[in-house]
Amino acid sequence: MVHAQFDPTSREELAIAAVEAKIAKDLSWQQIADAAGYSPAFVTAAVLGQHPLPPRAADTVAGLLGLGDDAALLLQTIPTRGSIPAGVPTDPTIYRFYEMLQVYGTTLKALIHEQFGDGIISAINFKLDVRKVPDPDGGYRAVVTLDGKYLPTVPF
């Protein structure tokens, strides 16, 4: 049976324990995702409390991290999503995304609506990918792909 989790505290505590275990076992998110059989973005979000994992993946992740049966069950619950507290984020990495949306949010809205019409991009039917690519000018660039299904507004 599918269960919903309404108190984010237990998932937050599990996320802390999972990250501590990940560090202690010197595992990457990619290794955890490979074991679970899903993308690194999805598994990372799930372990950090933003998605439920399917039963087999939850058992695998909990086992790999040494978290036990209770953690495996908790990883399967539908969480209360939204890990950023109200207000402006203070973590520099998260803040840069906030800043990008402050600068380009209206541009994205205008371009999306021009191409698709009135509606939204789903964060449920959604894929996320992060890649590290060489920068021709030296160093590296982060390529972040947000791939969501377009859902048109339907008059009623």
From Swiss-Prot:
Q: Which UniProt keywords apply?
A: Lyase
Record has Lyase as a keyword: yes
Q: Catalytic site residues?
A: 96, 99, 122
* EC number per UniProt: 4.2.1.104
SMART domains for this protein:
Cyanate_lyase
Q: Reaction catalysed?
A: cyanate + hydrogencarbonate + 3 H(+) = NH4(+) + 2 CO2
The answer on whether this UniProt entry bears the keyword Lyase reads yes
* Signal peptide feature range: none
Might you name a Gene Ontology BP term for this protein? cyanate metabolic process
Q: Which Pfam families match?
A: Cyanate_lyase, CYNS_N
GO MF term list: cyanate hydratase activity; DNA binding
**InterPro entries per record:** Cyanase, Cyanate_lyase_C, Cyanate_lyase_C_sf, CYNS_N, Lambda_DNA-bd_dom_sf
Family, as annotated? Belongs to the cyanase family.
What the entry lists under HAMAP family is as follows: Cyanate_hydrat (MF_00535)
NCBIfam families per UniProt: cynS, PRK02866.1
The UniProt function text for this chain reads: Catalyzes the reaction of cyanate with bicarbonate to produce ammonia and carbon dioxide.
This chain's protein is named Cyanate hydratase
What species was this sequence derived from? Mycobacteroides abscessus (strain ATCC 19977 / DSM 44196 / CCUG 20993 / CIP 104536 / JCM 13569 / NCTC 13031 / TMC 1543 / L948)
